[in-house]
């Protein structure tokens, strides 16, 4: 592990990408401490608890929401917009489906629409959030209670989201890994210690016999270890489909090529968890504009993973998004065509259409196992808060840890691939 990190910094180009990414994250972190104009940050000094959606925004935004900073909306509107756009591409909007098949040009068009939708959502949600928080804090948040003040705050928060989207693009282009994922990763890491401290304080408050509190702490540590091991297993597990070659191959060529087709048990990674959590924010937005309406509150309660209905919906969403994104990441038809062109085949399966059907069947089975495993791992922290009386930050913290592990694994793989590529080029140049 240490040697791997050393290798990252030995390669100049990779080292520069790491430093660039860190510089962008420093800018992100500084922004989480700059309050939006016209607000009183001291209004949050005496928090009265928060809901799951609020905790999610705060966690993904690196604590920016509870400071009501310029990055208070974070990157969540972009995630929500991405979900909507992915769904609309499924022949719901023919033009989007057409763009999705146009390669790089089509992807650029879809990305632009996603950004416009994200900025629109950020503006709508920021207005509602300003009203909700000001009411929640009994008018102590907004200094000047005027329409112009609310509009100014909404514009600044929307600009903050737009800047974070741009920041993510810069990291993707010039830094390490996927920029949006890296920003979420950094935001979660910066709030995770506070969640653990809150848990420690809650566990020992009012406890004459501290043995029960220490038992809770031990239980949390064991749970975190099991969650980490389980997450790594489900994210890294691979099914190897054997491959044979129709043409004669020399021993040398066979030795240089993989004789199997690797399919991940969970090809979607942690994206389904991020999407499922962000999806809950859509119905909860109604409470921002209709805080006193009973029907809006009922919808919001159903969209809370802590409620019985919300927990079932959360599990179903994770499973559905896992299937959906697995087939976005893995294209059985393209795989079958590539195997046929290379003169290779799966033993006992005809090349072409039969191979496509076989890969699809295997992917369905693997994704079923992966989605159930992912749902179980995601639901455990929620059950812990529900039945052990733990603070809600642990619920978000458990899900966040899963996201952190997934992003860390993908980023490490990206770095290793870049180092290997540089070493290969260096070897070829000598």
Swiss-Prot record:
It comes from Staphylococcus aureus (strain NCTC 8325 / PS 47). GO terms for cellular component: cell envelope Sec protein transport complex; plasma membrane. GO terms for biological process: protein transport by the Sec complex; SRP-dependent cotranslational protein targeting to membrane, translocation. It is found in: Cell membrane. Gene3D superfamilies: SecY subunit domain. This is Protein translocase subunit SecY. The central subunit of the protein translocation channel SecYEG. Consists of two halves formed by TMs 1-5 and 6-10. These two domains form a lateral gate at the front which open onto the bilayer between TMs 2 and 7, and are clamped together by SecE at the back. The channel is closed by both a pore ring composed of hydrophobic SecY resides and a short helix (helix 2A) on the extracellular side of the membrane which forms a plug. The plug probably moves laterally to allow the channel to open. The ring and the pore may move independently. One of its GO terms (molecular function) is signal sequence binding.
């Amino acid at each position: 592990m240490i040697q791997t990190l050393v290798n990252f910094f030995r390669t100049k180009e990779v080292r520069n990408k790491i430093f660039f990414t860190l510089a962008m994250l420093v800018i992100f972190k500084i922004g989480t401490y700059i309050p939006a104009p016209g607000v009183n940050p001291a209004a949050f000094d005496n928090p009265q608890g928060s809901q799951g959606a609020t905790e999610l925004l705060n966690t993904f935004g690196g604590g920016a929401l509870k400071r009501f900073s310029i990055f208070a909306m974070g990157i969540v509107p972009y995630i929500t917009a991405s979900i909507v756009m992915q769904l609309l591409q499924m022949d719901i909007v023919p033009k989007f489906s057409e763009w999705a098949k146009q390669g790089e040009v089509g992807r650029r068009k879809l990305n632009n629409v996603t950004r416009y939708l994200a900025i629109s959502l950020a503006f709508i949600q920021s207005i509602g959030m300003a009203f909700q928080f000001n009411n929640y804090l009994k008018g102590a948040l907004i200094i000047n209670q005027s329409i112009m003040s609310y509009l100014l705050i909404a514009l600044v928060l929307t600009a903050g989201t737009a800047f974070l989207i741009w920041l993510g693009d810069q990291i993707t282009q010039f830094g390490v890994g996927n920029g949006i994922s890296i920003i979420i990763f950094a935001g979660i890491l910066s709030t995770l210690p506070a969640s653990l401290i809150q848990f420690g304080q809650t566990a020992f408050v009012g406890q004459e016999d501290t043995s029960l509190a220490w038992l809770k702490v031990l239980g949390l540590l064991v749970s975190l270890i099991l969650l980490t091991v389980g997450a790594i297993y489900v994210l890294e597990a691979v099914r190897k489909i054997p491959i044979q070659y129709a043409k004669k191959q020399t021993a040398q060529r066979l030795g240089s090529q993989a004789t199997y087709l690797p399919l991940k048990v969970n090809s979607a990674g942690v994206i389904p968890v991020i999407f499922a959590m962000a999806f809950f924010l859509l119905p909860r937005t109604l409470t921002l504009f209709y805080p006193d309406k009973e029907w809006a509150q009922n919808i919001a309660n159903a969209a809370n993973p802590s409620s019985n209905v919300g927990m079932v919906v959360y599990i179903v969403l994770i499973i559905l998004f896992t299937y959906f994104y697995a087939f976005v990441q893995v294209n059985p038809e393209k795989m079958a065509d590539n195997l046929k062109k290379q003169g290779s085949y799966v033993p006992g399966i005809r090349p072409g259409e039969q191979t496509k059907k076989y890969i699809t069947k295997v992917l369905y089975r693997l994704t079923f196992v992966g989605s159930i495993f992912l749902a179980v791992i995601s639901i455990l922290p929620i059950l812990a808060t529900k039945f052990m009386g733990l603070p809600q930050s642990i619920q978000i913290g458990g899900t966040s840890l899963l996201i952190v592990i997934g992003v860390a694994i993908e980023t490490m793989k990206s770095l290793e691939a870049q180092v290997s590529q540089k070493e290969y080029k260096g070897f070829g140049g000598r």
